[in-house]
Amino acid sequence: MNALVLEEVRTFQIRQVPQPVPKEDEVLVQVGAVGICGTDLHIFHGLANYHRDELGKPIPLRTHPQILGHEFCGRVAVAGSKVTKARAGDRVVVDQVLNCRNQGRVPRCEYCESGDSHQCEFGKELGVTGIPGAFSDFVTVPESSIVLLPREMPFAKAALIEPLGCVTHACDRVDRASARYGFEGKSRIRYALIAGAGPSGLLFLQYLRNVKRFDGEIFVADLKDARLALAQKMGGTPLDVRKVDMVSELLRRTKGERIHYLIEASGSGAVFDWLPWVIRRQATVLLYGGGHAGKDIGCLTQFQATETTLVTTAGASGGFDKDGTPTTYRLAMEYLCEGKIDADSLLTHRYSGLDQIARAFTEDANREDFIKGVLVRAEAG
């Protein structure tokens, strides 16, 4: 089969690789669509490498090239002999994290036992930790990693289930935190701020408006006009960080009250120049974006002084329904089916073949109008 292989930093090559063969409890998925994630971009540009040896040291691409792609869905091509959940031809989305449950480990680690499978002690991730991902024709996955898709859901939209699952999981982490300000009760959140209007930031905005039914003001900070315009259309108050002083502007707009709930979804180190000074005492800060290049952790001193509830989050995996379905993926799929999330506005760039993906990582990702890219494979139907 064909696969797009990352052989060196910023170097993709289409290669012929062996087509995987599913085990008796696995399915072979023909890739229908795969989203291009910020994590993929970080790995491509050499800013991150999550493929590590037993000591936690990164394994260089020249030693072990990688096949990226973890936000994916497709059609079951072959079902193993013990698979009962799906059969050939079924349309599925995939939870790409390999954990104790889908690896058949007994006993399960403490994280999988508590429903936090994304932190599995023995966890791996398709397309991220060195295991071949969906920038290829086919991928084998455990039966327990799939969720059946409705017939009417296009593959392109289904490729957003994983990133929306990340947002769903992150907001659940905040709900479970013992924080002063919440969406209900006496100390209600009145002002929220999302730093970054990329795909994740815009998903957070829609989640707060349409899932949490939050009716307070949501400021959205970014530096691209197209993203700010879309944020405003989705119910946010846009703030162009190039044109305003964020501290004075937010003090003015909140009448000195400051921000009760701040979501950092940009991954930009520059955010921390103003973030500690715009939040209210005992506010909640959700750290979602990755990277923050060029910044130390000096801002934590201010977080300590104001007793900030700092919530960190990673991934979309978590607990499972009684029938073994990954809960977060099911919820994300339901939000899309119910129309609570506008997927089409986020999918600004579509690609039809592996040979087009490199352009997404080099030229298109820097375009003013680029929000989210997705590869849609016509051959999967």
State what each model feature region is.
Residues 223-227, 269, 292-293:
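Helix N-cap at the beta1-alpha1 junction of Rossmann-like dinucleotide-binding domains, i.e.
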Residues 93, 260-263:
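N-terminal Rossmann-like NAD(P) cofactor-binding module of classical short-chain dehydrogenase/reductase
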Residues 225, 273-276, 281, 326-381:
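C-terminal hydrophobic helical "lid"/dimerization subdomain
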Residues 252, 256, 295-348:
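C-terminal substrate-binding/catalytic core of Rossmann-like NAD(P)-dependent dehydrogenases/reductases
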